[in-house]
Amino acid sequence: MRHSIGLAAALLAPTLPVALGQHIRDLSSEKWTLSSRALNRTVPAQFPSQVHLDLLRAGVIGEYHGLNDFNLRWIAAANWTYTSQPIKGLLDNYGSTWLVFDGLDTFATISILWTANRIHGQSVSPVSGSMYLPALEACQRRILIRKVSFRGGVTAEVNTCYLHIEWPDDVQLTYEYPNRWFMRKEQSDFGWDWGPAFAPAGPWKPAYIVQLDKKESVYVLNTDLDIYRKNQINYLPPDQSQPWVVNASIDILGPLPAKPTMSIEVRDTHSGTILTSRTLNNVSVAGNAITGVTVLDGLNPKLWWPQSSVIRTSTMFLSLSKVEGTRPWPVWTNGRASAPFFLNQRNITEVQRAQGIAPGANWHFEVNGHEFYAKGSNLIPPDSFWTRVTEERISRLFDAVVVGNQNMLRVWSSGAYLHDYIYDLADEKGILLWSEFEFSDALYPSDDAFLENVAAEIVYNVRRVNHHPSLALWAGGNEIESLMLPRVKDAAPSSYSYYVGEYEKMYISLFLPLVYENTRSISYSPSSTTEGYLYIDLSAPVPMAERYDNTTSGSYYGDTDHYDYDTSVAFDYGSYPVGRFANEFGFHSMPSLQTWQQAVDTEDLYFNSSVVMLRNHHDPAGGLMTDNYANSATGMGEMTMGVISYYPIPSKSDHISNFSAWCHATQLFQADMYKSQIQFYRRGSGMPERQLGSLYWQLEDIWQAPSWAGIEYGGRWKVLHHVMRDIYQPVIVSPFWNYTTGSLDVYVTSDLWSPAAGTVDLTWLDLSGRPIAGNAGTPKSVPFTVGGLNSTRIYGTNVSSLGLPDTKDAVLILSLSAHGRLPNSDRTTNLTHENYATLSWPKDLKIVDPGLKLGYSSKKTTVTVEATSGVSLYTWLDYPEGVVGYFEENAFVLAPGEKKEIGFTVLDDTTNGAWVRNITVQSLWDQKVRG
């Protein structure tokens, strides 16, 4: 049944009525101060908060402009104390008083003073999620939280606690601060190759004083609602004909009832109609948990689907009666009915082999019994300081995901376990969240104390988010199996088997049972990237036998990640991995000029200025040095090579314009490289590898700096996110030009679940826009039918066979028109897509000035773009500072005489609409022209 370990953190339900026998005081309403010897003064503080932000509000420091990520390191090195003013008005007729912290980051000591002058303190080292202190010995009307102290400078000291552990040389990955693997704190707080290392501290989540009645009281710490098909097992596909099972478990604080009852009510989310009410059976009390189960025979609720045109579900309400026959207390809502997700890693069957699928094993997701193509990206922490991340900000980010035709985000470890409201937003918007435990790119301790601590962390979080239909998977960590174990094998081959054993001890023997004991509806993988498993035996000491490198040539097994910074092979299809699923891949680029201007002074806006280079953390410093020019030059050089190898080299006389053009050029390379890979992976859905997912690195930025992101800090879209929106459409036409052999193939790829049919028009133009005689020997139109989750080749030739006078003066325009049914829909929908191909790199093309004309309709709030004298490649609409939003289409091709009317979605506007006068349009021609 349900498994709970120790003080497995507290989840406050602040809306619970006082009838539950509790009095709750939100400590965010109290007055707080922040102090430190390093500051030598006291400043006002907020709660929840983080030290850097309180110092910023008090005017002690500024934003991390320029190189302030280095200049502010004194904050992480100091000890800091939050102190409340006396908290008055507490009740004196309650049986116990509890102090509940939802999140303290990270090494904290709490001291409490109340009117009887009695002091209670407890060290917290560290707090993985929430925690609650034992009941105070007396109920008093006044409490002073004398100190919530956070210890700084521990990254060096913590190593002394683990002197018995010796890692193999050159294996552990230090980005800036050392020894992060010993601390249960957001690992990217200590630096990563896409973000700064502020190592923030503070009470980053709410805190409460909870008073429980002497006779009848319930305080909900956590709720686990597991909804699955009868007889379902995590690693096997559920039988969709079986009835639903609801297994509910409530972790409570206070005296456990002897004979409690539990009940659920299921309603249609939209109409509010009650579909069924049930009393749970086999209610049991164990530890601090009350658990019950019921089978929903005969109930067929509306199901949740990812990226459905309408998210129609049923909502579950859970109630608890402390004593049988007494009035029930509503303790939980918002359990949306959904078929559990299943990660299929089973062996390829003979039926699949007969369909042309290569031997090996599957690696794809299934929802409600349907396999589907996962399209998305990787989510990193959206800010260095979580307390300024708002629900509105995440909602806007997720809207960009939906608009970008993505249905899945991989929640990368190691950030923080996501807030509940983020899962709520994913539920609402139909976004799947591949979730991971917070272990990344490191070897971690495996002593009993460490494992006991992380076991509580895992149990709490599995139970906390299990009711969300957006939860797609739990993975044990990031790249532990695919990166860290091979690093051990290379650096210390004699120790390899030992560290494989340590890996299995934690990520399989410990984590897998903890997941399976707390949910039957979600699959588990011990690492983000694996070759899958050989077998599962839950009675074995290592219940999942990983495949590792026990693979056979010609067979495919697991998922892949891929980073190749050799730009000479960026568009070589033979350099891309062939697997069942791509969970990470990418290349970095510069943010736009407007985003750079938020953080860097004008005099520093040069491509290789000191400030720009030191804000680039790829390659990372590997320590706390502040002159990482040598490593940074590697990443800057990679971007430079990507530009000069394939694109016109910007050469503007004005240094700001030149800097902006270079930033844009790096984005063109990044977007083209991702597009090339995603077209390759999506085509794989119809190839022997049966490839069913691509999640690129990364969705968004944590600050203003070079990174792999498609959405810049502040919300501005790079070229990448626009191009991903286009190439993630349901049915696409894609050209594949092999520049070595000269072959040119055109494929149609579909992620619909049923066949789609239509035509593709193929039109050859020279770059002045004139049709090439005889269409270069290419058919003008090709009909096609493509199967569900499949791809089909509609045209193939060799460049040498085409009637092209000059391959540097030619472009193939592809226009698809089709009809088919979207997933989970009975209606036929018209679908279109446009693409293009050139047979020379952009830098070598004989482009002409396209004569772009730009207009704006205030009545329609649309922009009109027209090419008048040549083909416009990489047509790019841009908007000025003072507004944030996105164009409905961008980075497109325009032929002469072609006019596009494009809408713009405004998210923020501080210009009172004046921004429209400063919209600009450019193309590849502008990158080439000297100015």
Swiss-Prot record:
Gene Ontology molecular function, alphabetical: beta-mannosidase activity
GO biological process: carbohydrate catabolic process; glycoprotein catabolic process
Keyword Signal: yes
Pathway the protein takes part in: Glycan metabolism; N-glycan degradation
pH profile of the protein: Optimum pH is 2.5-5.
Residues bearing glycans: 40, 79, 247, 282, 347, 550, 608, 658, 738, 790, 798, 830, 918
Location, primary (coarse class): secreted
GO cellular component, one term: extracellular region
Cellular compartments annotated: Secreted
InterPro entries: Beta-mannosidase-like_N2 (IPR054593), Beta-mannosidase_GH2 (IPR050887), Beta-mannosidase_Ig (IPR041625), Galactose-bd-like_sf (IPR008979), Glycoside_hydrolase_SF (IPR017853), Ig-like_fold (IPR013783), Mannosidase_ig (IPR041447)
Reaction(s) the record says it catalyses: Hydrolysis of terminal, non-reducing beta-D-mannose residues in beta-D-mannosides
Temperature optimum or stability note: Optimum temperature is 70 degrees Celsius.
UniProt keyword terms in alphabetical order: Glycoprotein, Glycosidase, Hydrolase, Secreted, Signal
E.C. designation(s): 3.2.1.25
Stored Gene3D superfamilies: Galactose-binding domain-like, Glycosidases, Immunoglobulins
Xref: PANTHER family: BETA-MANNOSIDASE, BETA-MANNOSIDASE A
Task performed by this protein: Exoglycosidase that cleaves the single beta-linked mannose residue from the non-reducing end of beta-mannosidic oligosaccharides of various complexity and length. Involved in the degradation of polymeric mannan and galactomannan. Releases the terminal mannose residue from mannobiose and mannotriose, as well as from galactosyl-mannobiose (GM2), galactosyl-mannotriose (GM3) and di-galactosyl-mannopentaose (G2M5).
Family stated for the protein in its record: Belongs to the glycosyl hydrolase 2 family. Beta-mannosidase A subfamily.
Designated name of the protein: Beta-mannosidase A
Gene field: mndA
